[in-house]
Amino acid sequence: MKKLTLQEKQNTADTLLKRINALHEPGETVRLMEVCGTHTVSIFREGLRQLLPSGIELVSGPGCPVCVTDQTYMDKALAYAEREDTIIATFGDMLKVPGSYSSLSEAQAKGAHIHVIYTPLEVIELSKKYPEKKIVFLAIGFETTIAVICATVKAVHEAGLKNVFFLVSHKLVPPALRTLLDRQEGHIDGFILPGHVSVIIGEEPYGFLPEEYGIPSCIAGFDGLEILSAIANILEQRKTGNIVVGNTYHSVVMQKGNPVAQAMMQEVYDICDDAWRGIGIIPNSGLALKDEYAAYDAERALPIELDKPSLDPKGCQCGRVLQGLIKPSECPLFGKSCTADHPVGACMVSVEGSCAAWYKYGYSSGGSTWED
């Protein structure tokens, strides 16, 4: 794709905004949910809210993998971290996610063996470097990450490694969107669909949105122009009544996605119900290792029982934020007891979390309150 000059970008933005204003009915409120944490950050960074008509409201959804990871999962991870014979391998943004009583960063400060890795395949190096230890990898993430972790599971299996285990809590995006619509707690007029996830799954898994719910949607890239283009696409669907799964990210996202990655996921995992933070159990929204790979499933190979109940942080409204029911600034803890330096909830921990984005980018010009 040709790289646009600054002037060309400005001209394109002007054209898109004129189109959006023409498609939006004055006085009408349209609530669009961006389902990807990267979109949330881009919307703030590029100041898109300030450019759109006042009636177009952008709300954040359950698009941050760290944020939607259930509290019980974190408590299990911490329980494994307490074992002397165990090394936890994890992505760095999991360190500060609060469990019921502690966090991985706090456990690490007390002597727990926790290694931050940048690619799942690093667990193989850890396995060989520490053959006397059990390596437990925190396998979280949406479809984008799942494909890479599948390759790691297969590599561990083929290498015959006996000390690598996966604590799995993968999440699938389409079932979560269905649950949000079924609950009908918050009015959603359209979805800005995630780009990276859609590279893997394609357009077809979102087909239920127009077919069953009559909800317009559009797959979007990640810069401001691509997001504006998706918003214009959704508004045009509403205007014409031709409700479809739009795709303004054609250069990357194919209709059927990545069949190789999909086949690998089907080979390694079975679909299962899974718990989402603040939302609860969503049917068919998770993955579990197939029986063929049960020896690498931490919960089956290294069973653990929690001796205390899992508790959400008192007062934290992360679950309501993830469902688009409230803005982060409407949580009573936001900017007070819950800040980027001292996060109470998972939505403030991850760089893709809605609360973290609001906190970083959402200051008003006065610097003391957050813009709504």
What are these regions (language model features)?
Residues L6, C67, L138, F142, ...:
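Hydrophobic alpha-helical scaffolding
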Residues M1-E132, I146, V156-E158, L167, ...:
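Metallocofactor- and cofactor-centric catalytic cores in central/energy metabolism, strongly enriched
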Residues E57-S60, I114, A159-F166, I188-F191, ...:
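Short hydrophobic/aromatic-enriched beta-strand-loop microsegments
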Residues E185-M254:
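A conserved active-site cap/scaffold subdomain adjacent to cofactor or substrate pockets
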Residues L58-C64, V164-K171, C218-L225, T248-S251:
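A generic structural motif
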Residues G27-L32, N163-V164, T240-H250, W276, ...:
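Flexible, glycine/charged-enriched surface loops at secondary-structure junctions
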Residues K129-A139, T144-P194, I200:
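Active-site histidine-anchored catalytic micro-motif
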Residues S229-R320:
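Internal helical hairpin/lid segments
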